[in-house]
Design a protein with these regions (language model features):
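N-terminal leader/signal peptides at the extreme start of proteins
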Residues: 1-27, 105
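N-terminal single-pass transmembrane signal-anchor helix
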Residues: 27-50
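Aliphatic-rich helix starts adjacent to a transmembrane/signal segment
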Residues: 51-76
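Short extracytoplasmic
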Residues: 72-91
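Ser/Thr/Gly/Pro-rich low-complexity, disordered linker/stalk segments of secreted
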Residues: 92-114
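GGW-centered surface loops in extracellular recognition modules
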Residues: 107-197, 331
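Short aromatic-cysteine micro-motif
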Residues: 178-181, 209-379
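C-terminal, surface-exposed recognition/capping segments
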Residues: 337-340, 362-447
Length: 447
């Protein structure tokens, strides 16, 4: 190989080395750029995903916007419907659901679509029906019952609160079963709206009363009714409790003695709070000898039973009326929540603020005959002692008295009235005392 060829060969080798160095450098730069690009893309992707899927992301905002649009549309439809009902009530005298309409009181100009109680008087409803009085106070009429009209005959329902004989919750609205004629009175709980734009609050609960005078010792219940606390044991006057679990009771007189308790205390409380009230029998119970069921009717002989049988009879009066396996309404013996809260209702709206301390008995008489009618409810302050589902822990020597009666009574042996509406008295599980029968009063609660 000559000199010229050697020179060319060396140049070629040098160029190859240089090319390899340049290629390596370019490859390193490209890889770095690629890594940087990927990192940037990942960062941007994270930002983008966060912008899309985060709590305040695009999708969430879009959903919120759609929900707000849907709610605005529904509000518009509701407003149009209310306006239509209001116009219809002014032009045709009724609401869109076929019942007399009108505004509620208290400054609320939004028309109510709830039927007025006044339009349903005398009509047996074919389902549980919510209705309201002129002041916007709601009741629930059970299926198969009707609201009684104001009357002037003995034993009639009377409505005087509004001054026009139209039923108002403050009067004690009377319902009657369309088949058997049994009567009950609505006892409201919660906030009640009055005709002068004031309100009163009646709290469902067990209250304490002075054992000597019968007077209410505190407007705050000793046990406020709630589903959460109904299982708690709260003792009044050292011996009186309302047990939450059902038991049938027995007639024992020793330490095994038990009273019969409420059918389903939690259900009574939950339905009462949800509906804003419950029904208490208008009269002390009598007994139909043909059907062997108790009744709540005017001018009937008061039934005498043991506490255990009183609970059984009250439960079986209507049982648990159900449709599609869902409760419509149920009957039970009055419990201490119902008895005490009824006293509060009557003292608030009857004009007799000392009702808890009264006994109006002048004789032992048939149901509704004594002058003892307040808020359309008869004889709670007198006539017969009345069994409740309340429990007594009292014992004397070896005798136990697990049952509790309430109210005043008239003694047939000496012709005098004893005790008063709020009185609690422990008793054994007997049918009759030496001075008169032990009566009962059922209640209804509506789903």
């Amino acid at each position: 190989m000559n000199k010229k060829e050697n020179k060319i060969s060396k140049e070629i080798k040098i160029n190859k080395k240089s090319a390899r160095r340049n290629y390596s450098n370019q490859t390193g730069i490209t890889l770095i750029a690629l890594v940087v690009t990927i990192v940037v893309l990942l960062i941007l992707a994270g930002v983008s995903l966060n912008a899309i899927f985060s709590e305040n992301g695009i999708i969430k905002r879009a959903k919120d916007a759609q929900n707000k649009m849907d709610q605005a549309t529904q509000n518009d439809l509701d407003a149009i419907n209310d306006l239509s009902n209001w116009i219809d009530s002014k032009t045709n005298g009724n609401t869109g659901d076929g019942s007399t309409g009108g505004n509620t009181t208290g400054g609320n100009d939004k028309p109510s679509t709830t039927p007025k109680i006044s339009t349903l008087v005398g009509t047996v409803v074919d389902k549980n029906t919510k209705a309201e009085d002129a002041y916007g106070n709601k009741i629930t009429i059970p299926k198969g019952f009707k609201v009684l009209a104001h009357g002037t005959e003995a034993g009639s329902a009377t409505y005087t609160y509004s001054g026009d004989n139209i039923p108002a919750v403050q009067d004690g609205i009377v319902i009657e079963n369309g088949t058997d004629g049994n009567q009950f009175v609505w006892v409201p709980v919660g906030t009640i709206k009055n005709k002068d734009n004031t309100t009163n609050t009646i709290t469902l609960g067990r209250y304490e009363f002075d054992s000597n005078t019968g007077a209410l010792t505190s407007t705050t219940p000793a046990q406020v009714a709630s589903v959460e606390n109904c299982t708690q044991t709260v003792t009044i006057d050292g011996k009186f409790q309302e047990l939450s679990s059902f038991r049938p009771g027995n007639t024992a007189t020793d330490s095994t003695a038990q009273n019969a308790t409420a059918r389903n205390l939690e259900e009574f409380i939950s339905t009462t709070l949800a509906n804003g009230g419950y029904y208490i029998a208008r009269f002390e119970a009598s007994e139909n000898k043909t059907t062997n069921k108790i009744e709540s009717k005017y001018n009937q002989t008061v039934a005498g039973k043991t506490q255990q049988n009183a609970v059984k009879a009250a439960r079986e009066m209507y049982g648990e009326v159900k449709e599609n396996n869902k409760l419509v309404y149920a009957s039970d013996l009055v419990n201490s929540y119902a008895w005490d809260t009824t006293i509060i209702f009557i003292q608030t709206y009857s004009g007799t603020s000392n009702y808890a301390s009264l006994n109006k008995s002048t004789s032992f008489a048939k149901s509704g005959i004594n002058n003892d009618k307040y808020c359309n409810i008869w004889d709670m302050s007198g006539n017969a002692f009345e069994w409740t589902t309340e429990y007594s822990t009292h014992s004397l020597d070896s005798f136990f008295y697990p049952c509790v009666t309430r109210g005043g009574y008239y003694r047939t042996d000496d012709g005098n009235a004893y005790r008063c509406t709020s009185s609690r008295l422990f008793n054994g599980n007997v049918t009759i005392l030496a001075h008169g029968p032990l009566g009962l009063r059922p209640l209804l609660y509506v789903k």
